[in-house]
Design a protein with these regions (language model features):
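N-terminal intrinsically disordered/low-complexity leader segments
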Residues: 1-17, 206-209
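Hydrophobic alpha-helical bundle segments that form small-molecule/ligand-binding pockets
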Residues: 86-90, 123-124, 136-164, 179, ...
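Amphipathic C-terminal alpha-helical segment
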Residues: 106-110, 139, 144, 148, ...
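All-alpha amphipathic helical-bundle segments outside canonical DNA-binding/catalytic cores
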Residues: 91-99, 130-134, 151-167, 185-192
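Short secondary-structure transition hinges
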Residues: 105-143
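Helix-turn-helix
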Residues: 17, 21, 25, 29-63, ...
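Hydrophobic alpha-helical connector segments
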Residues: 67, 81-110, 165-168, 191
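Short, basic, alpha-helical segments at the C-terminal edge of helix-turn-helix-like DNA-binding modules
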Residues: 70-77
Length: 209
């Protein structure tokens, strides 16, 4: 009992650290092999523990994967909200949107989040529905910024903002699949490019007589 109290005073308990290790291992295995190919046995082997010991921390492989996905959305949300806060309350909604998109991109590249999203569709419906609720709450941050910009007359009319949001976030999420950290563009460059497309468009307008 004294050891347990001491561990809690010092921060994470041994169980907390084991759980965190299992999450990190599963995250890496999903990225390398996809969720279909991993098993509790392969997770245990990578974590250097017995498969049966996992049940002290998680009830199933699906529960571990759900936790990995939740940690991903939670981490992205934290990064995005921090970027918005850093932009300042007096900044325009478009500047805050740029900051949010940049933070989203940085996080998805760092965490290779696209590989985890493929696992969502394979979760049991109950776990999938829970994860999608988190995704909707996260997406609402970006939806709110677009709506604020629209109310302030900063956006052209005639666009479906839900589609704009989904296209923008979806495009940035999948950058990790092709991004080369040694290439000519940084994540900031890519986020700036997207904002240029959103704000000015790609196709030249014909000159009016």
């Amino acid at each position: 009992m004294q050891q347990l109290v001491k561990a809690r005073k010092n921060g994470a308990t041994k169980a907390d650290k084991t759980r965190a290790r299992l999450i990190e291992v599963t995250k890496r295995l999903i990225q390398e092999h996809g969720s279909d190919r991993i098993t509790l046995r392969s997770i245990a082997a990578s974590a250097r523990m017995k498969a049966g010991s996992i049940y002290y921390h998680f009830n199933s492989k699906d529960e571990i994967i759900r936790t990995v996905l939740e940690s991903g959305v939670g981490g992205a949300r934290k990064s995005v909200l921090q970027a918005i806060d850093d932009a300042g309350p007096d900044s325009s909604p478009l500047l805050r949107l740029r900051a949010a998109l940049g933070a989203h991109l940085e996080y998805t590249i760092q965490e290779h989040f696209s590989s985890r999203l493929k696992a969502v569709r394979r979760l049991p419906k109950r776990l999938r529905d829970h994860h999608m609720k988190q995704e909707r709450e996260y997406a609402a941050i970006f939806a709110g910024l677009l709506q604020e910009a629209q109310k302030k007359g900063m956006l052209r009319s005639g666009f479906n903002l839900s589609v704009v949001r989904m296209l923008s976030m979806g495009a940035l999420t999948w950058v990790a699949e092709w991004y080369d950290p040694n290439g000519p563009m940084t994540p900031d460059d890519i986020a700036d490019e997207l904002m240029r497309i959103l704000s000015g468009g790609l196709v030249k307008q014909p000159n009016k007589p």
